Amino acid sequence: MFCEKAIELIRELQRASDGQLPAFNEDGIRQILEEMKALYEQNQADVNEAKTEGRSDLIPTIKFRHCCLLRNRRCIVAYLYDRLLRIRALRWEYGSVLPSALRFHMSTEEMDWFNQYKRSLATYMRSLGGEEGLDITQDMKPPKSLYIEVRCLRDYGEFEIDDGTTILLKKNSQHFLPRWKCEQLIRQGVLEHVLS
């Protein structure tokens, strides 16, 4: 039956839950494209016959096949677009390096698209926030407070905050500092977040 394979392709995506990426169905796409080619060739033959022999009884069949072509095309585009949205979401969830199990489910073109998206996102983040850039993938949920209490794990020396205030970070001293200013030092092991 017409368009059956295209609808099955869409159902395959619907069966996969959000956040999952089913294996790229290259065989299904190829079968749909072959069906579209056959429908197009049949339409071309019938259009030529309708023109030369004046057979207007072929027009409904031609229109039906044309509608099937359009539906197949819409289904393929929807399949590919949904996969790209899922791949884009994976970049935000897993970072710039995908697990091999996910890469296995992607086509070569999808891997190329992912790598280009990754580079574009990195370029955009470097253009924000001055010299270091701004990692917009870091805090996917807004912090509960702008200031946090931290304990100094080792002697660091003077630390300047944006308002010009300098703080002496000595081992075991505790401070109430802006979260975004402390995150780098927490990652370096100079400070630790004190949870009350």
UniProtKB/Swiss-Prot annotation:
The keyword Nucleus applies. The keyword Transmembrane does not apply. Keywords: Chromosome, DNA replication, Nucleus. This is DNA replication complex GINS protein PSF1. GO terms for molecular function: chromatin binding. GO terms for biological process: DNA replication; DNA strand elongation involved in mitotic DNA replication. It is found in: Nucleus; Chromosome. Required for correct functioning of the GINS complex, a complex that plays an essential role in the initiation of DNA replication, and progression of DNA replication forks. GINS complex is a core component of CDC45-MCM-GINS (CMG) helicase, the molecular machine that unwinds template DNA during replication, and around which the replisome is built. One of its GO terms (cellular component) is GINS complex. Pfam families: PSF1_C, Sld5. Component of the GINS complex which is a heterotetramer of gins1/psf1, gins2/psf2, gins3/psf3 and gins4/sld5. Component of the CMG helicase complex, composed of the mcm2-7 complex, the GINS complex and cdc45. Belongs to the GINS1/PSF1 family. Its main location: nucleus. Gene3D superfamilies: 1.20.58.1030. The gene is gins1. It comes from the Eukaryota.
